[in-house]
């Protein structure tokens, strides 16, 4: 899967990149702001973007996801805080930032399934889907 990572903390971005590369994904680029994310997305056409909710200089991951959505790129946030339903309609969902290798990779597979239009068997505990009916279908609750 071709993935764009939008994260302003270089060490965190590199860790995410290494996890994804190790699992056979292709990281098309790492951006630390909206301008760079849009430029990379236009050039590389990623399948999805993983976006930090809070970027440097007060930039919002919501704004980045909205801009990428106009380019046809589906986004998922990662955050340390619960974003409520702020991203509903803009992103598929969010991962808690302390997701670990397995949590990240399992979440990417669920996101891939959702983008492909299939319903995954389950959700990893680190991933929350904004679409409540879909969340219920997946969790069986």
State each model region's role.
Residues 106-108, 115-141:
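CheY-like receiver
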Residues 17, 30-48:
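Acidic, metal-coordinating helix/loop segments flanking the phosphotransfer/catalytic sites
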Residues 51-69:
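Conserved phosphotransfer microenvironments
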Residues 7:
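Conserved acidic carboxylate
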Residues 14-18, 22:
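Charged docking surfaces used in two-component/phosphorelay signaling
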Residues 42-44, 67-73:
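Conserved phosphotransfer cores of two-component systems
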Residues 98-100:
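Hydrophobic/aromatic docking surface of two-component receiver
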Residues 72-84, 95:
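A short, hydrophobic beta-strand element within the central beta-sheet of small alpha/beta folds
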